[in-house]
Amino acid sequence: MYEGLASYFLPTGVLKYFEVTDFAEVPTLETEVLYTTELHIYLDERDNRPPDMSGSVSDGFGDESCFLDFPARDKKTVLHVRRRRWTMPDGTTKSVGLDKKIQLKHPGTRYSKDFALFLKKADG
């Protein structure tokens, strides 16, 4: 529903693996900040099971992770990401490995990869 517009705001490739489920614009709770409004975008992982997981059953979603992304139209942007959990035929729980397909955050940060690299260049 929101994906056409969201494709302009989200990191490249995100919509291949996640769907936008909601968004919200909320006032920033902090004072003395650059942005007085926050744009929250909620993403749920799509069914991206590889063939070796075809016998698994969806077990809902794991805990939500939040990442900061580029500000959009003078609004701090926060991505809320929920990854799927799968129950395998042997009863174990597993998630689809996305690390080689898409990097949601820059290692050691809570920033999207592109935003972290931008900040690193801006800071010298």
What are these regions (language model features)?
Residues 67-124:
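Short, positively charged, Gly/Tyr-enriched micro-motifs
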